[in-house]
Amino acid sequence: MGNHDMKVYGRSFEGSVAAFEAVYGPSYYSFNVGEVHYVVLNDNFFIGRDYFYIGYLEERQLRWLEGDLSYVPPGSTVVVCFHIPSTCSERDRKQFEYGKAGLTMTNHRGLHAILKPYRAHILSGHTHTTYNQPVTDSLYEHVIPALSGAWWQGELCTDGTPRGYGVFTVDGGEVAWYYRSTGRPADYQMTLYDGLDYPQFEGYVVADIWASDPAWRVELFADGHSAGIMERFEAYD
């Protein structure tokens, strides 16, 4: 359930989800497929002021999740899906303030603590940007950009990622993933800029790799030979 799927006017959070649940069923639930346990949560929390919501998991859902996972053996693979991310990229973190509490889950520490005994992957979205964030050795968040790009106004999301979707494959309890740009082959994974075509990058080669994470080691090759390890930085594409 996303922030555009709820009623954003009324007097309470409970009223904001009623229409969605009347048509589609519960806004949080779980199921098993193979060796993986999947959980869907709703962290779009309407606070009773028209069009104002925050990223927040109510205590009712957290208690339900604790009960649900009590049937899942520790060490199992768990995939948790919700809309507003529980982590921020470095760029988004610099922008975070109380007035932007709808950008990330405000009480994420409680969720992360519940997931600690498991090999957990979080799938989220909302920001129209892409980043992968290792939270701990056993918890990894995938923030997936929008299929609509810049709200159907352009082919790129706000960080330069082409509009598209995440592809996840599961083998037993092992999860693999990659980003797939709409209308592009699976190996289309970056935009490359150099100083010849882009004067602002004179003396540099810049690679915007959409599905990378902070632990990636990116090596540049030229004419079949290594030109060195590329330095990671945060910027807008």
Language-model region placement:
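Solvent-exposed serine/threonine-rich low-complexity stretches and specific carbohydrate-binding patches
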Residues: S226-D237
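Cofactor-binding loop segments of dinucleotide-utilizing enzymes, especially the Rossmann-like FAD-
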Residues: G2, D43, H83, S212, ...
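Binuclear metal-dependent phosphoesterase catalytic core
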Residues: L139-H225
